[in-house]
Structure formats: C-alpha cells, structure tokens
A protein has these predicted regions:
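N-terminal secretory signal peptides that target proteins for export/translocation
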Residues: 1-19
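N-terminal secretory targeting signals
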Residues: 2, 21, 40-44
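Bacterial N-terminal signal peptides
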Residues: 21-33
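N-terminal signal peptide c-region/cleavage motif recognized by signal peptidases
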Residues: 35-37
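Acidic, serine/threonine-rich low-complexity disordered tracts
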Residues: 41-142, 184-289
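Hydrophobic, well-structured mid-protein blocks that either form specific transmembrane helices
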Residues: 138-178
C-alpha cells in the first residue's frame, strides 16, 4: 500500500505593484508599476530563445582541493503542446561521470513545460543522488488572481508526499524561472540589489533571494571570454546570516546564456562551464574580442 501524505499551503501576499522584470541564474524579480493578476504576472514576451537551442556544459567537482571532471550537463529547448495549446519544453540533463560517482552519484533530469507567453505549466525533476532516487512534480494553474501549484514527490518505493500552494505572485520552478529571466533587461539593477521570488521545488514553495553582484569577463571551457552579469543565490540562517549557495555568470547580451555556475556544497564545491551552444536566437555580442 502506497502512503500518501498531503498538506495545504495557502499564501496570499498583498503584492500591489509587482511585475516580472528580471530573473537570471538563473533568476530574478523586479518591482514594477502595475497591479496584475497572477496569470498576467506569469506572462512575458519571449525575446531570448528559440526552438532548437542546445547548450552544453562541463561539470567539475572539488574534493580536498583537487578539481575532478565530474560529468556533463545539457540544456535543450523544443516546441511542444500542452492541453492542445502550443508550448515550449525545456530539458536539463545532468550526468555525473564514473570517476565522480566515487564521491557523489548524480543523475538528474529536469523538464518543464511553459506556454508561449512563458507562464509555468508543468515541472518534473527525476534525481538519483547517491543511493536516493526521487521524482518531484508540479502542476500550475491560474484562477481569481492567484497562481496555484499542486506538488508531488514520489520515492523509490512508490510512497509519495503531496502539497498544494497558492500565491498572489507568480510561482516559478527551477527551469521556468530561467526561461522568463532570459527575456528581461537588467539595465536598471544596481550592485547589491536583492531580488526575492517564490519557487516550487516539488515538495513546497520556498522564498528565494538573489543578489546582483555586477559585471565581469569570464572565460568559458571552450576558450571564449564573455562579458557577464553576476548574480548570487543566497540563503539565511536563523540568525539572519547570509550564505552563498550558487553564483551565476550569464552573458551580457540578448541571449542571457549561463556561462558559468559556482555551487557551494556541504561536502565541497562544484562548477559548471559553458562548452558549446547551438541554435541561439541572437548573436553572442558579449564575446570579448
């Protein structure tokens, strides 16, 4: 018999002047001048990517001051339909190498479906990390000015947890937030600006915080140097002390492609470097000559 545990999480936030403005790294939200219902807040014009885009990354893991090639990751975007409506399907595959398995086994597959106006519709993450395997899913819907998300985590033995959440802001997942972010203009950001937004993980909705750090030239794994925007995803402990979780470096051009990610783990650190990109919609004008 499969065990089902269900919890409800209803969050009504009085957000009057909110609209999506930037989210990179994969991510960010900006305060705007219009009061919009949740469904409209989740909509945006796609100015950054197109069907057929394929981005490849090399993954490295640091263990006792030694950097080890840990595997590969790929990010692909293709056209699809969802409930008979045209949509985009974005896939992120992270595959650890056999050498890296000695330290930490990683087999992650993330999929999201977004509408043509980039609103979140569905998210799935299948993760094999060490001896644990889980599937996290989220289904998004919109009604009466609220964004609803039904979430489910399924374990290897078939048991599962479920949760329902609602928010007057748009709720994102790990990939839909990246898709939206890539179409926004970061020109208005100042170094140190903090961007907060709700994200569905498949188990619950969490408040995330990003900090804009500025610009820097970054050399990718393919030997190309890019002018990049830098964002940090941070966490806060019970005393309010800030802890860096991920640092994102994204191209300062219309593509807003992640070039490098620095991840700070409990048992070490990891990096992801851009190796190759195909099918990009715009020229890579961020390349430093």
């Amino acid at each position: 018999m499969k065990i089902r545990r269900k919890k409800n999480e209803i969050i009504r936030t009085g957000v009057v002047n909110v609209r999506c403005k930037l989210i990179i790294g994969l991510v960010a939200l900006m305060t705007g001048a219009f009061a919009l219902p949740a469904s409209a807040q989740c909509e945006a014009k796609n100015d950054a990517f197109q069907t057929g885009e394929h981005v490849m990354y090399d993954l490295y893991f640091n263990w006792k001051f030694v950097w080890v090639k840990a595997g590969l990751a790929s990010l692909t975007t293709n056209a699809t339909t969802y409930h008979s409506e045209p949509a985009f399907r974005i896939n992120l595959l992270a595959l650890g190498s056999k050498r890296a398995d000695f330290f930490f086994k990683m087999r992650d597959t993330l999929t999201c479906v977004i509408g043509e106006k980039l609103e979140p519709r569905y998210f799935r993450k299948g993760a094999e990390e060490g001896k644990r395997y889980t599937v996290d899913e989220a289904w998004f819907s919109y009604k009466d000015g609220l964004c609803f998300v039904n979430q489910k985590r399924t374990y290897r033995d078939g048991n599962f947890d479920e949760a329902v959440a609602s928010d007057s802001r748009c709720i994102y997942d790990m990939l839909s937030i990246l898709a939206q972010a890539r179409s926004y203009d970061p020109a208005d950001y100042k170094i140190g600006d903090k961007i907060k937004f709700p994200m569905a993980t498949g188990r619950k909705v969490e408040e995330q915080t990003l900090i804009y750090r500025g610009k820097e030239n970054v050399k990718a794994e393919n030997g190309t140097t890019y002018r990049c925007l830098i964002f940090s995803l941070v966490e806060y402990d019970k005393k309010g002390k800030e802890k860096e979780v991920i640092t994102f470096f994204i191209t300062d051009d219309l593509n807003h492609l992640p070039v490098r990610l620095d991840l700070y783990l409990n048992f070490g650190s990891a990096k992801a470097f851009l190796n190759d990109v195909r099918g990009n919609r715009h020229p890579l004008t961020s390349i430093v000559k």
